[in-house]
Amino acid sequence: MAGLKLQAVTKSWDGKTQVIKPLTLDVADGEFIVMVGPSGCGKSTLLRMVAGLERVTTGDIWIDRKRVTEMEPKDRGIAMVFQNYALYPHMSVEENMAWGLKIRGMGKQQIAERVKEAARILELDGLLKRRPRELSGGQRQRVAMGRAIVREPAVFLFDEPLSNLDAKLRVQMRLELQQLHRRLKTTSLYVTHDQVEAMTLAQRVMVMNGGVAEQIGTPVEVYEKPASLFVASFIGSPAMNLLAGRVNNEGTHFELDGGITLLLNGGYRQYAGRKMTLGIRPEHIALSSRAEGGVPLVMDTLEILGADNLAHGRWGEQKLVVRLAHQERPTAGSTLWLHLPENQLHLFDGETGQRV
């Protein structure tokens, strides 16, 4: 096994504007890291830099304790799996998986052994003589993974490999990828815009925005303690409720823009008088009553999702979403009395957007 290290790497196309700001990342031997973020955040550019398909402007890349910053892709010990499979249509499954080894001059017996083992791992044994057109989307993606596996790379690089699959097949392939990583234990760097893929596959998640790694942490850390407003708004479905306002001068209440006041029981005196953004996830808002000091919300819309329901309303101009149990189905225009548990509140600086 081998690790991967990015040391203050940057990328600029014109020598002036950095599309990747100085970024440092240590990926341990056998670790599965997922880079997630919106389109244009730099995640695919960073992956291509690791692969050697794009040159690093400044900084260094290390794979298996070797500096590979200027090395050609073929010499880096990496294997890539792409969104579009990139299979040769005139070749069989077996020939597609073997082709990369063949052009490297590997012996026929060794190639056959590697292909056979990869086919066994991916349950492709009975499909080796078929052409890509005879396969389903999931089977084609497994062939693409098999082609990477036979190379026995130091690092796997995945560039949105599940994007072309339908929703049901994506769920199945996520499970297969998890099982594959547990078996192979190969260091992996995976790019996706899908937060569900990121949260279910990753041992650690790197949330990217504008060429910056906003947060690197386990899925639980990123979800429970988002480092910034961007992470809070990007991770989670539905997104965290983010309410602009200020802590009052005594540090005892949070005053929302729009007139609603929320009680803060303690620990906020150091933020007294400051503009802040208060965050709380929809599932952490509890139903209460007027007598118990609940805060009123007039519900605009109810989304019935099956396992649970989402109630939408507004406090002033600010939107609020509350996740309700399946049996809770209030009608539009009704008033919900809400309790926001203080141990589930998140505060972000009003100017920097960073968690406080």
Swiss-Prot record:
Q: What SMART domains is this protein classified in? A: AAA
Q: Which PROSITE patterns match?
A: ABC_TRANSPORTER_1 (PS00211), ABC_TRANSPORTER_2 (PS50893), UGPC (PS51315)
Source organism, top-level taxon:
Bacteria
Q: Which InterPro entries match?
A: AAA+_ATPase, ABC_transporter-like_ATP-bd, ABC_transporter-like_CS, ABC_transpr_MalK-like, ABC_transpr_MalK/UgpC-like, Mo/tungstate-bd_C_term_dom, NA-bd_OB-fold, OB_MalK-like
Listed under GO biological process in this entry are: carbohydrate transport; glycerophosphodiester transmembrane transport
Using the record's annotation, list all stretches that form the ABC transporter domain. 4-235
What's a single GO MF annotation on this record?
Answer: ATP hydrolysis activity
Against Pfam families, the record matches this protein to:
ABC_tran (PF00005), OB_MalK (PF17912)
- Please give the GO cellular component terms listed in this UniProt entry: ATP-binding cassette (ABC) transporter complex, substrate-binding subunit-containing
What reaction does this catalyse?
sn-glycerol 3-phosphate(out) + ATP + H2O = sn-glycerol 3-phosphate(in) + ADP + phosphate + H(+)
Q: Which UniProt keywords apply?
A: ATP-binding, Cell inner membrane, Cell membrane, Membrane, Nucleotide-binding, Sugar transport, Translocase, Transport
Catalytic class of the enzyme? translocase
Q: What is its EC number?
A: 7.6.2.10
**Could you confirm whether the keyword Methyltransferase appears in this record?**
no
- Coarse class of the primary localization is membrane
What is this protein's function?
Answer: Part of the ABC transporter complex UgpBAEC involved in sn-glycerol-3-phosphate (G3P) import. Responsible for energy coupling to the transport system.
Describe the subunit structure.
The complex is composed of two ATP-binding proteins (UgpC), two transmembrane proteins (UgpA and UgpE) and a solute-binding protein (UgpB).
Q: What is this protein called?
A: sn-glycerol-3-phosphate import ATP-binding protein UgpC
- Species name: Escherichia coli O6:K15:H31 (strain 536 / UPEC)
Q: What is the lineage of its organism?
A: Bacteria, Pseudomonadati, Pseudomonadota, Gammaproteobacteria, Enterobacterales
